[in-house]
């Protein structure tokens, strides 16, 4: 229930409409968030047509706002994907944590994704090098911000995970992060070095 209030979905299924009993038209979930001694209601109504969420008596504009009100990460049966899954699984988990401690992160992340899509599209369509590289300033700036936010969050997460590992398992657990390009060069240098391969494959290889 807590996860659903914070994410607008269940960690067991992505189809919220399946949570509505066959003989009913909706289900309602409510709770209260206590912040610095101030208690405010949060609630959600799920129907076959979608989800309506409210916080402190007003409609919530989107799931991003909901998540800032009730930040939650779940360790569920699918957590093994963080280890044996691809890097996309780990980035998704990490980025969700960053979003909660750096509210502006989502804006930088979207900006980076937008620039990356344009950069890749220019590569795939075989545009002239100067047209492809025209996206580099936007891509570079957003990528550096995204990478820096991830590194700061991971430093905090590393401390917490290390403490839990020692206390519960008696093990030393450490976490590391690869930025997506060599630490011996800047991202701009990495993009230049991989440009020929990027054009050949229609994909940007260096980046967070």
Report the location of each language-model feature.
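Nucleotide-state sensing region of NTPase/ATPase domains
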Residues: 6-89, 93-105, 155-163, 188, ...
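Conserved NTPase motor "head" modules and their coupling/switch loops across ABC/AAA+ ATPases, GTPases
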Residues: 4, 16, 35, 45, ...
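Extended, highly charged alpha-helical segments
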Residues: 75-144, 148
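Glycine-rich phosphate-binding P-loop
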Residues: 1
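Residue-level marker of positions within ordered structural domains that often coincide
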Residues: 24, 124, 151
């Amino acid at each position: 229930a807590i996860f659903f209030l914070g994410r607008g979905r269940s960690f067991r299924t992505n189809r919220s409409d399946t949570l509505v009993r066959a003989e009913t038209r909706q289900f309602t979930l409510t709770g209260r968030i206590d912040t610095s001694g101030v208690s405010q209601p949060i609630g959600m109504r799920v129907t076959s047509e979608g989800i309506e969420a409210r916080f402190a008596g007003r409609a919530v504009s989107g799931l991003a706002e909901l998540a800032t009100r009730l930040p939650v990460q779940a360790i569920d049966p699918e957590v093994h994907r963080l280890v044996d899954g691809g890097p996309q699984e780990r980035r998704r988990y990490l980025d969700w944590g960053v979003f909660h401690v750096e509210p502006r992160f989502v804006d930088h992340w979207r900006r980076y994704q937008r620039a990356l899509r344009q950069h890749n599209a220019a590569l795939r369509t075989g545009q002239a090098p100067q047209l492809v590289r025209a996206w580099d300033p936007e891509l570079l700036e957003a990528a550096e911000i995204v990478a820096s936010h991830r590194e700061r969050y991971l430093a905090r997460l590393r401390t917490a995970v290390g403490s839990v590992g020692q206390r519960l398992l008696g093990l030393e657990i450490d976490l590391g992060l690869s930025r997506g390009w060599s630490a011996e060069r800047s991202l701009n240098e990495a993009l230049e070095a991989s440009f020929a391969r990027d054009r050949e494959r229609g994909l940007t290889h260096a980046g967070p």
